Amino acid sequence: MDPGKIKMKLKRILKDLECHDAELSILITDDKHIAELNSRFLKRKGPTNVLAFPIRENDPNEPETSMLGDIVISLDAAMRDAIKTGESLTKMTDRLLIHGLLHLLGYNHERSEEAWRMEEETERLLGMMER
C-alpha cells in the first residue's frame, strides 16, 4: 500500500465528484481491529471489509466542513475478497476506498435502487482510476 498512490487516486476521484477541498482520513488495518470498531460503533459482530464514519449526517443545521470523515479498511478482508473475486489486491483496495468514500458522501445500499446506483458509481470511478 503506497500512501502516495492512494492520495493521488483519491484526489482524482474527489475532483471528479466536485469535492475540491474535501479531506478524509484512511486507516488500513486488520480483521481484529476492524471487528472491534464494528462492534463498538455499529454494534455488529465480527470483521467487515470497510467502514465509513461520516463527519456530517446530512443535517442542514450542521456547520459546513471540508472534512468528510474516516474510512477504515481491513487488509485481511480485502485479501479474501480479492481472492474470491479474482481481482488484484490493489483493485480490491481501490474498490473498498471508493465504497467508503461514497458512504461518506451520503450513498447507501440499504434498498436495491440505492445499491444499484452505488454500484454503478463505484464501477465508473474504478474505471477512471485505471486510466
Give the positions of each predicted feature.
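An acidic/histidine-cluster motif and surrounding catalytic segment
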Residues: 1-94, 105-131
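Periplasmic solute-binding protein
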Residues: 102
